[in-house]
């Protein structure tokens, strides 16, 4: 059975970028939390980052073990398809299926679909 994870290109690109920035955004939140007084004017930015992180974490937590591992290889470790195949043994089909599934589910979680 073929999964239909088709979404508009601009939404796909936006969500993919958010997923690729996940690790950096987590670090940013930790930086804010450790020195909140220094970032008084950026409360809105912090809230937006926290919301996006929550959407992504909700989706990651809902995935089965294989999809979760693939998502971490793709978006957290940021392997290319060929790199993931060589270093992690993730097939091309599994790579793209997991990537498309996670992007679709995050877009849906963000109410972009």
Which residues fall in each region the model found?
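A short pre-motif secondary-structure segment
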Residues: 70-71
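DNA-recognition helix of helix-turn-helix
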Residues: 89-112
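N-terminal interaction/assembly modules
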Residues: 1-62, 110-113
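Helix-turn-helix DNA-binding module
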Residues: 77-94
């Amino acid at each position: 059975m073929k999964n239909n994870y088709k979404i508009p290109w601009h939404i796909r690109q936006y969500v993919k970028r958010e997923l690729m920035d996940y690790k950096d955004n987590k670090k940013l939140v930790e930086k804010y939390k450790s020195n909140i007084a220094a970032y008084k004017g950026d409360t809105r930015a912090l809230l937006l980052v926290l919301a996006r992180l929550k959407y992504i974490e909700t989706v990651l937590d809902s995935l089965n073990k294989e999809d979760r591992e693939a998502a971490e290889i793709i978006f957290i470790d940021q392997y290319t398809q060929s790199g993931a195949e060589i270093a992690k043994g993730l097939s091309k089909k599994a790579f793209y299926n997991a990537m498309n599934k996670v992007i679709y589910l995050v877009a849906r979680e963000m109410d972009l679909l």
